[in-house]
A protein has these predicted regions:
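Feature responds to low-complexity, polar/acidic, surface-exposed segments characteristic
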Residues: 26-28, 440-456, 469-488, 492-517, ...
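Extracellular/surface recognition and adhesion modules
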Residues: 17, 459-462, 523
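Bacterial N-terminal signal peptides that target proteins for export
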Residues: 2-12
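Sec-dependent signal peptide cleavage junction
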Residues: 21-31
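Helical cap/lid subdomain of alpha/beta-hydrolase-fold lipid enzymes
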Residues: 158, 163-440
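Extracytoplasmic/secreted envelope proteins and their assembly/folding machinery
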Residues: 67, 71, 93-96, 100, ...
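N-terminal non-catalytic accessory region
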Residues: 29-217, 384, 389-440
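Hydrophobic core
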Residues: 13-17, 21
Length: 534
């Protein structure tokens, strides 16, 4: 036994009666990208939005709206920021593919399988150059998504991490190479993800505003077709070339009009309006995990107040007037089931005019859970001011903001320059504070182990060494007793042991599928334990 292991063993023995632990998950293979404070921030817009590539952005920047360009302001403070441009009404999948192509400066590949399933072209527009240099080789990216930009960036990260076996197989069958987006192994290319007013779990706006939604979808499709074949496309681009909505120079004007306006975009079931429903959002969430190396932040808004008579939620005086009808309907829509069986309770009434406040906290799966890959709670509330070290692999739910949906990006006539810029200065500070944490070693996350506690230095040293973790993302339970199973798990971690091929023990109280079974098997095989009975 080395001197180092002897030292750690003595620490374990000292803590035997005072600590508890959980098994640390194994790290996944990754095409590692270095991460540093040189990593830029890329903003991803929501439904009907635009980025710096759109002509309209010079006149009315999406990020900043009537308060002026937010990215220019943040750049003046020394931050490197960009605003991506993806399809305003495209699905989360298509937008994720477009985001990848924009970050790499390539042609959009929507995937052979996805394109066939939704009956549209596999390839889309070409981005002439990367949004910034060095992504994936020298720098990672920090993503900030507003509204539907949340689902876009979360699905993007999932594909970057785990890829799509279906798309790889479909590309091979077609005799083509898959997009690198679908091969996965690139989670370290994303350092953090911040979502503002993002309907992680869908929005009841769609369910409660049927007439408004019918008008919105029909108008959007008509505008997309008209803009797509005229010079207005340079000002505002719906980017629906994959559906045949584009101007063909080899056609007459009449031929183009007939071809484009005969298409039925909504019938492809590959659009933002569908993905924003509660049922579809939960379906998307079921395929997305929380990555242990990525930092997550989420901001929800509420610009409604409770009616003292009905108890429902109505728009506040500070909400943009155009949001009033939708917000009012959302504020009284509850005690109902979606077509997929999700129950909308009273907590879904407060909203920002477009998104339910509760839906913007953190993403849940269809079973209602939000868990890390090792089964722990995947979110925690943060008060916005406590001096803590943010940890990766955990959603930090920030304090609810008194913003309507558009005030989060500057507002329309009701925006506040001071409030908007203060919000994003805080977001930048939180993002870049995570690099300070990384540079000074593994941050100690346990709020129930004060530095003044006698066991603090021992627990911290074992935590830094990867021998122990906590009973949750932020708790260690230092007064809890240690079980025999937990102790041999610590010993195996200390020894760096391979516990995968040890024969099973005869102990009836060690089920084969138990998390601790491999560690007990290892301990018995090496003569460390003998059992409390035969």
């Amino acid at each position: 036994m080395t001197r180092r292991n002897k030292r750690f063993l003595s620490l374990l023995l000292a803590l035997t009666l005072a600590v508890s632990l959980c098994v640390l998950p194994a790290a996944a293979a990754d095409q590692t990208c270095p991460s540093s404070k040189d990593d830029p921030v890329v903003f991803v817009h929501g439904l009907m939005g635009w980025g710096q590539r759109a002509g309209i952005n010079a006149m009315l920047p999406y990020w900043g709206m009537t308060t002026g360009s937010l990215t220019s302001y943040l750049n003046s403070l020394g931050y490197e920021t960009y605003s991506a441009t993806v399809g305003p009404i495209s699905s989360a999948w298509d937008r994720a593919c477009e985001l990848y192509a924009q970050l790499t400066g390539t042609t959009v590949d929507y995937g052979a399988a996805h394109s066939a399933a939704h009956d549209h072209a596999r390839y889309g527009i070409t981005y002439d150059r990367p949004l910034f240099s060095g992504w994936g080789t020298k720098r990672a990216v920090n993503l900030v998504g507003h509204s539907f930009g949340g689902a876009t960036t979360r699905l993007f990260l999932e594909l970057m991490t785990n890829g799509s076996a279906e798309e790889v197989a479909a590309a091979k069958a077609a005799g083509t190479a898959p997009s690198p987006l679908f091969t996965g192994g690139k989670s370290s290319w994303v350092h953090s993800m911040t979502e503002v007013a993002a309907p992680h779990n869908g929005t009841s706006f769609i369910e409660s505003n049927g007439t408004i939604m019918d008008v919105a979808t029909n108008l959007s499709e008509t505008l997309a077709k008209g803009f797509g074949i005229t010079e207005i496309k340079n000002l505002y681009d719906f980017q629906l070339e994959q559906f045949g909505i584009y101007k063909d120079p080899n056609e007459t004007v009449l031929e183009t009009l007939q071809r484009v306006f005969s298409t039925d975009f909504m019938s492809h079931n590959d659009n933002a309006f569908l993905d924003l429903t509660i049922d579809k959002s939960l379906e998307i969430n079921d395929g997305i995990g929380i990555e242990p190396n990525v930092y997550y932040f989420s901001y929800a808004g509420n610009q409604t107040v409770q009616d003292p008579v009905s108890g429902n939620y109505i728009p506040s005086a500070k909400m943009w007037t155009l949001f009033y009808p939708g917000a009012y309907n959302m504020g009284k829509y509850y005690d109902k089931y979606t077509a997929g069986g999700f129950y909308i309770d009273k907590s879904w009434r407060p909203n920002d005019g477009m998104v339910n406040t509760v839906s913007a906290f953190y993403p849940i799966h269809s079973d209602g859970t939000c868990l890390t890959k090792d089964g722990k709670q995947g979110w925690t509330n943060y008060d916005g001011y406590s001096n803590i070290h943010f940890q990766p692999g955990l959603w930090y739910v920030m304090p609810v903001q008194s913003f309507d949906h558009i005030q989060f990006v500057g507002g329309m006539l009701n925006g506040s320059l001071v409030k908007t810029r203060a919000l994003y200065r805080g977001i930048m500070e939180d993002i870049y504070s995570t690099y300070t944490t990384a540079a000074t070693g593994t941050a100690f996350p346990f709020t129930d182990v004060a530095e003044s506690r006698w066991s603090y230095p021992y627990i911290k040293e074992l935590y830094d060494a990867g021998v122990v973790s906590g009973t949750s993302a932020t708790t260690f339970s230092p007064a809890a007793n240690v079980t025999r199973a937990q102790f041999v798990t610590m010993l195996a971690g200390l020894a760096g042991a391979d516990v995968s091929n040890c024969p099973a023990t005869p102990f009836r109280d060690v089920p084969e599928g138990a998390w601790y079974a491999p560690y007990v098997n290892w301990a018995l095989a090496n003569g460390i334990v003998s059992g409390t009975s035969a």
